[in-house]
Curated annotation (Swiss-Prot):
One of its GO terms (molecular function) is exodeoxyribonuclease VII activity. Transmembrane segments: none annotated. GO terms for biological process: DNA catabolic process. It catalyses: Exonucleolytic cleavage in either 5'- to 3'- or 3'- to 5'-direction to yield nucleoside 5'-phosphates. Bidirectionally degrades single-stranded DNA into large acid-insoluble oligonucleotides, which are then degraded further into small acid-soluble oligonucleotides. Residues 69-88 are annotated as: Disordered. One of its GO terms (cellular component) is exodeoxyribonuclease VII complex. Its EC number is 3.1.11.6. It comes from the Bacteria. It comes from Xylella fastidiosa (strain M12). Keywords: Cytoplasm, Exonuclease, Hydrolase, Nuclease. It is found in: Cytoplasm. This is Exodeoxyribonuclease 7 small subunit. Belongs to the XseB family.
Length: 88
C-alpha cells in the first residue's frame, strides 16, 4: 500500500487559497450587503488572511534568498519555515 504524505499546511502552500478567500471577502464587503456584525467578522477574517499571506510571502522571499546565495552555492539544506519570524 503506497504511503501518502500529509498535505503541506505551511503558509506558502496555503497562499493561493488564503488570497482567494481574502479577495472574496473584499468583494462581499464592497457590495455593502453585509450587516455591521457580518462586516466586522469579515474584517477580522480578512486581517487573519492578510497576515497568513504576508507570512507566506516572507517565507518564499527568504527561501529564494537562501537558494540564490552565491556564498553557499552547494547548500542543499531544505528550507526550514520555523526560522521566519511570525510576530507582526
Amino acid at each position: 500500500m503506497p504511503k501518502h504524505s500529509p498535505p503541506d499546511t505551511s503558509p506558502v502552500a496555503r497562499f493561493e487559497q488564503s488570497l482567494q478567500e481574502l479577495e472574496q471577502l473584499v468583494q462581499n464587503m464592497e457590495t455593502g450587503a453585509l450587516s455591521l456584525e457580518q462586516s466586522l467578522g469579515a474584517y477580522e477574517r480578512g486581517i487573519a488572511l492578510y497576515r497568513e499571506c504576508h507570512q507566506a510571502l516572507e517565507q518564499a522571499q527568504l527561501r529564494v534568498r537562501i537558494l540564490s546565495d552565491p556564498m553557499r552555492p552547494d547548500d542543499g539544506e531544505p528550507f526550514d519555515p520555523s526560522i521566519v519570524s511570525t510576530s507582526q
